[in-house]
Amino acid sequence: SSAASDVYKRQEHIPFPFALPEAGLACMTVTAIQRAALPGIPAGYEAALGQVWHNYAVARLTLPAPQLVEMDCNVGVKGEGFEYIFGRGKGLVSIRYNGVQLLDDTVRPNFWRAPTNNDEGCAEPFTFAFWKTAGLYARCDNLTAETKGDFVIARANYTLPDGQTLPIDFAIDGAGRCDITMTWQGTRTELPEFGLLFPLRRELTEVSYLCLLYTSD
């Protein structure tokens, strides 16, 4: 939202010029913009930026758990209009919605991002060089799956090249929604990024995603 305010006050309360949603995830972004030019500060300069998130509870559809199909090499999770396939030695390898394949490659953990100028100045690429390939060569050593209530939970246990372990839980409900939980168990606590890579097919030209503030660009 945008609203004018006197910057000379220590605190200012500005009502939102729109109604807040009754359900769902809402993000409010507030910026402080320099109105007039000052010595060394041009007009329009963004002096401050902040975000506030509100997650209004949304009632889930009450659907039975999807079907769990276990095979020698793969584990499948099927529901109306969707299918997930996990490879026992790879992890999540396929997501289909309404017959359309979404993934172009295996979903895998990722710990690296493009270094910024500040990172370069602090020699962080040298310090954290291990993480550049840690996710690329992470190995899925074990895959388990079970039905719990309205969910099928598949757990992929990864081992990094230095022996650290990373379990990832995929909880899939009857509507095809997948909640992912990554639990870090390693001894190294400083790393450039902690996330998952989802290689999507090039044919998917209209994809939207939600990215929280201050994550990697």
Residues of each region from the PLM?
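Short, small-residue-biased leader/transition segments that mark boundaries at the very start
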Residues: 3-8, 217
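M14 metallocarboxypeptidase catalytic domain recognition
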Residues: 11, 29-30, 66-67
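Terminal connector regions
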Residues: 20-59
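Exposed aromatic-hydrophobic patches
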Residues: 12-19
